[in-house]
Amino acid sequence: MTLFNPLNSKKRSQQLKQLLDSEKLVILPGCYDALSAKLIEKAGIKAGFMSGFCVSSTRLGMPDTGLISYTEMQDQVRNICNITSIPILFDGDTGWGNAGNVYRTVRGYADAGAAAIMIEDQKWPKKCGHTKGKDVVELDEAKARIKAAADASKLNGDKDILICSHQEA
């Protein structure tokens, strides 16, 4: 058994893109740690999704309201990527702030091995996606976040992580 999986973010993002480009339904079961992600892989499922709600509820017993830090989430990403070979879409919440924070978050997830990251348009600190009264950023800030994520997704001009935009607006 290999402790660390050598697949990098670019290889994983290519795997996920191939799945998404196919004519087949792509199922992304939710995981929250290395074990749950490994169980998804062992079940023969081709990809997964690390949910911020799942991470927050299993680590803190609390809903996804911004209590989990960027560092804690990046640690989860790294642990999951170290033990699995399937591509996983990771919840990047709001990117923990403005466009600069989004850039850092996307690069950090890519460096940890993520195939894809999902960024929300909520204001920081965020509210759980299942609750009412969520505030979203202004259109200019949303555009800046998306641009920052797209810029961060390219290392040396070569895309190495897919970007998904989660819109609450």
What annotation goes with each model-predicted range?
Residues N8-Q14, S22, M62-F90, D111-A112, ...:
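Alpha-helix-loop-beta-strand connector modules within alpha/beta enzyme cores
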Residues I27-D33, G48-M50, I88-G92, I117-I119, ...:
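Hydrophobic faces of well-ordered beta-strands that scaffold small-molecule active sites
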Residues T84, I88, G92, W96, ...:
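Generic hydrophobic/packing signal
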Residues Q18-D75:
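Conserved N-terminal beta1-alpha1 strand-loop-helix module at the mouth
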Residues S36-K42, W96-A110:
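Catalytic cores of alpha/beta
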Residues G48-E72, G92-A99, M118-D140:
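Glycine-rich, proline-tolerant flexible connector loops at the mouths of alpha/beta enzymes
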